């Protein structure tokens, strides 16, 4: 069992759903295992053959779409921002992705892999957060990118 598989959850999927608007099948973070406010977060996503995207990408040789690996990193980045603030600061707020730079894909992610999603804050000014994200499987980098996001009022 890998080191990341043995780590205890800081936040499980029920807690994650209280902070993110995403729901299955588009919720791509299973649990948070490390967190330092305003600095860094590590989350995990177990990739199974039951993921709906594997029905068409690609049936004979299933590979997780790179854009969904980036989405998983963006969801981890949103968790880092919302968990870093006080509950009254994020009440009725939603995190919107504003940009992705420097996205790179290093190797395929396949059923049975466990994605480790590590995000770090590089800059924060007001409601805008800049972060770097690295996705790994078994310690090997599978994808990386820089993200910019903003916490905004939820529409009612």
UniProtKB/Swiss-Prot annotation:
InterPro entries to which the protein is assigned, alphabetical: FabA_FabZ, FabZ, HotDog_dom_sf
Domain of life of the source: Bacteria
UniProt KW keywords: Cytoplasm, Lipid A biosynthesis, Lipid biosynthesis, Lipid metabolism, Lyase
CDD domains: FabZ
Reactions mediated catalytically: a (3R)-hydroxyacyl-[ACP] = a (2E)-enoyl-[ACP] + H2O
GO CC entries: cytoplasm; membrane
EC number: 4.2.1.59
Active site: residue positions: 57
Keyword Lipid metabolism: yes
Gene Ontology BP terms: fatty acid biosynthetic process; lipid A biosynthetic process
GO molecular function, one term: (3R)-hydroxyacyl-[acyl-carrier-protein] dehydratase activity
Subcellular location: Cytoplasm
HAMAP family, sorted: FabZ
Entry similarity comment: Belongs to the thioester dehydratase family. FabZ subfamily.
Role summary: Involved in unsaturated fatty acids biosynthesis. Catalyzes the dehydration of short chain beta-hydroxyacyl-ACPs and long chain saturated and unsaturated beta-hydroxyacyl-ACPs.
Annotated protein name in UniProt: 3-hydroxyacyl-[acyl-carrier-protein] dehydratase FabZ
Source organism: Anaeromyxobacter dehalogenans (strain 2CP-1 / ATCC BAA-258)
């Amino acid at each position: 069992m890998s080191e990341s598989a043995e780590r205890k959850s800081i936040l499980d999927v029920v807690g994650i759903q209280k902070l993110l608007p995403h729901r299955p099948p588009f919720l791509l973070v299973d649990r948070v295992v490390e967190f330092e406010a305003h600095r860094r977060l590590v989350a995990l996503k177990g990739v199974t053959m039951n993921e709906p995207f594997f029905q068409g990408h690609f049936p004979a040789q299933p590979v997780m779409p790179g854009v969904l690996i980036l989405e998983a990193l963006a969801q981890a980045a949103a968790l880092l921002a919302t968990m870093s603030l006080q509950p009254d600061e994020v009440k009725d707020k939603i995190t919107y992705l504003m940009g992705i730079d420097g996205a790179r894909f290093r190797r395929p992610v396949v059923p049975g892999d466990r994605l480790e999603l590590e995000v770090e804050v590089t800059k924060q000014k007001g409601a805008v957060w800049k972060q770097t994200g690295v996705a790994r499987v078994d310690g090997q980098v599978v994808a990386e990118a820089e993200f910019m996001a903003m916490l905004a009022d939820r529409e009612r």
